[in-house]
Amino acid sequence: MATALYTANDFILISLPQNAQPVTAPGSKTDSWFNETLIGGRAFVSDFKIPEFKIGSLDTLIVESEELSKVDNQIGASIGKIIEILQGLNETSTNAYRTLPINNMPVPEYLENFQWQTRKFKLDKSIKDLITLISNESSQLDADVRATYANYNSAKTNLAAAERKKTGDLSVRSLHDIVKPEDFVLNSEHLTTVLVAVPKSLKSDFEKSYETLSKNVVPASASVIAEDAEYVLFNVHLFKKNVQEFTTAAREKKFIPREFNYSEELIDQLKKEHDSAASLEQSLRVQLVRLAKTAYVDVFINWFHIKALRVYVESVLRYGLPPHFNIKIIAVPPKNLSKCKSELIDAFGFLGGNAFMKDKKGKINKQDTSLHQYASLVDTEYEPFVMYIINL
């Protein structure tokens, strides 16, 4: 069913000998069984086309099998990290594979129409060389994304620190973006300006008493510079020699003197620091999103080329030569994975020999010790045929 292709979270990549027939449906053609009988025809099944690769010795294949398993997991983890980063940036939904196209098509369509990229991964190379090429490229992409992500997080932290200076009430926040030169007495030998954050409930008290908080306060010099929900910010002009006396008395009356020496250079510097932090954060965010989305596509493509190699190597180890196999990718509707896998094992379990023959109750017997001679070398959890579950 085509709908399964777009609703599936799970895919099964399966390889069978070319002439294998389902024992649960004698006389049925294998392709017809996949499309019409498997879980009632609700799965979407398509051929997964893999070219023939240069095959070395049996020992070489076993080593490559182990390496492919490791690289498969590493690249899968890289994809998970990229999706996590994009989700953190609100650049993709939870179902990332539905929102990030591969080669301009949704992931399910890419899997349905998978083709080996012969220009990039040339077939005259050995399997070992192909593994190295794909692995190295994926590792470099992963490293690039992680490095850019670290730089972005650093810029984000710096911006948050700059933003904190602009937040909070007038008793604690930075004042560099609030005050103006005309709020201060500048370049005077004797006079200076003090800023005071006054709780709104004490505004009237301050206006009545500020001239008496110390000697040499300029009469009627207090004016409101700014106010918020909690405080009113006043400036007061007085003699420099009386600043300490004034601020001490102000604190005793629950007024809050703000330590602030007006400097156009400092104010300009602080504004530039904030603007620079904001600009860098935004620039790195754009760079990270672009890089992560590009890397996602490339790493995902690499991932399925590794899976193609893995299926091929495992199939040769299981079924031997010539390398003619029936390889399918199955889009499994939600909540049908266990049933689909069970029906596949019922139909093709005989390929595993006695280990997967049915017992007297008709159930697959996995306890037999006579597993395929390479089972312990090929897969941790042995299946009667080549099968990989892919969770997206």
Curated annotation (Swiss-Prot):
Keywords: Acetylation, ATP-binding, Hydrogen ion transport, Ion transport, Membrane, Nucleotide-binding, Transport, Vacuole. InterPro entries: ATPase_V1-cplx_csu, Vac_ATP_synth_c_sf. GO terms for molecular function: ATP binding; proton-transporting ATPase activity, rotational mechanism. Its main location: membrane. GO terms for biological process: endosomal lumen acidification; Golgi lumen acidification; proton transmembrane transport; vacuolar acidification. It is found in: Vacuole membrane. It is a peripheral membrane protein. GO terms for cellular component: fungal-type vacuole membrane; Golgi membrane; proton-transporting V-type ATPase complex; vacuolar proton-transporting V-type ATPase complex; vacuolar proton-transporting V-type ATPase, V1 domain. V-ATPase is a heteromultimeric enzyme composed of a peripheral catalytic V1 complex (components A to H) attached to an integral membrane V0 proton pore complex (components: a, c, c', c'', d, e, f and VOA1). Interacts directly with VMA4. Present with 21114 molecules/cell in log phase SD medium. Subunit of the V1 complex of vacuolar(H+)-ATPase (V-ATPase), a multisubunit enzyme composed of a peripheral complex (V1) that hydrolyzes ATP and a membrane integral complex (V0) that translocates protons. V-ATPase is responsible for acidifying and maintaining the pH of intracellular compartments. Subunit C is necessary for the assembly of the catalytic sector of the enzyme and is likely to have a specific function in its catalytic activity. Reversibly leaves the enzyme after glucose depletion, causing the catalytic subcomplex V1 to detach from the V0 section. Belongs to the V-ATPase C subunit family. This is V-type proton ATPase subunit C. It comes from Saccharomyces cerevisiae (strain ATCC 204508 / S288c). The lineage of its organism: Eukaryota, Fungi, Dikarya, Ascomycota, Saccharomycotina.
